[in-house]
Amino acid sequence: MAAEHDSDSVEPPGSEALLDAVLRTLYDLGETEGETEQKRIRKKKAKKRDSETIEDVAVEPLPLPGSPVRGQKKSASSFFQKLREELQSAPAAPSEVPVTTAVSLSPPKNGSKLVEVVEFQSKSKKRKLKSDEDEPAKNKTKVVKKDVDIQEFNLEKARLEVHRFGITGYGKGKERVLERERAIMLGAKPPKNTYVNYKVLQKQIKEKKIAVEEEKRAARETDIFKKKKKKGRGQEDRRSKKSAPSILSSGQVGQVGKFRNGTLILSPTDIKKINSSRVAK
């Protein structure tokens, strides 16, 4: 008993506060009067000591349950070890759990901290990928549209050049009128109509009608004159054909009938002449 009392007296002064803190975390013992201020101080001290003990455990591996402990800290470390054995009385081995904690809490060798690598994919990259995929289709449509526009522009330009070249064949007065019509066709505003008095307008209409009628009469007269000429020529041709004796049917040569396309054609008069000549003989 005396040895046990001596070992308790050797314990460090902060062991009682640590024991109280551990017991209060495990069991709800309730609060007494005047403990509020002391409790705060004890909690701060307990947190500092717990952090120190955890760092010691992380740096130095925990000893096995049968191994001896260093000098003065023998009683406190043995007490904590017993508590852990009681709390962690599970089917798993008790020595394996602290080793894992030690490994997890052990800092890296060169004093460098472990850094988590996070890959961040921004929306702009996704949009760029989609735009890169859509670019060839857009380029194709643009090329097709450009080709169509070029063809249409060339056709319009050619049409205007042909129209301009056709105007040059007329006189200056008509050329100006045609140029004005071309400008109106391209979208220019036509000139305003000139206002004329009603009586003057009636005279102009009558003059136009008279001019049209005269042109029609002249055309008719020319047509009649041409027809008369054609008729006279036709009658003269017929008379010349009848009056001109055929070389083959002339009595001087002694040939009867006419040749057409290599065949001899005899008229009924020719046949009668032949028959009468035979009877006379």
Swiss-Prot record:
Protein function: Part of the small subunit (SSU) processome, first precursor of the small eukaryotic ribosomal subunit. During the assembly of the SSU processome in the nucleolus, many ribosome biogenesis factors, an RNA chaperone and ribosomal proteins associate with the nascent pre-rRNA and work in concert to generate RNA folding, modifications, rearrangements and cleavage as well as targeted degradation of pre-ribosomal RNA by the RNA exosome. Prevents helicase DHX37 to be recruited before post-A1 state.
UniProt KW Transcription keyword: no
Record localization: Chromosome; Nucleus, Nucleolus
Residue list for modification N6-acetyllysine: 172
Any GO BP: ribosomal small subunit biogenesis
Gene: Fsaf1
Region (Disordered): 29-141, 221-254
Subunit-level organization: Part of the small subunit (SSU) processome, composed of more than 70 proteins and the RNA chaperone small nucleolar RNA (snoRNA) U3.
The keyword Acetylation is annotated on this UniProt entry: yes
Chief site of localization: nucleus
Record protein name field: 40S small subunit processome assembly factor 1
InterPro entries: FSAF1-like (IPR027973), SSU_Processome_Comp (IPR052852)
Highest taxon of source: Eukaryota
Residue(s) carrying Phosphoserine: 67, 75, 267
GO CC, one annotated term: small-subunit processome
Keywords (A to Z) from UniProt: Acetylation, Chromosome, Nucleus, Phosphoprotein
Pfam families reported in the protein's UniProt record: FSAF1
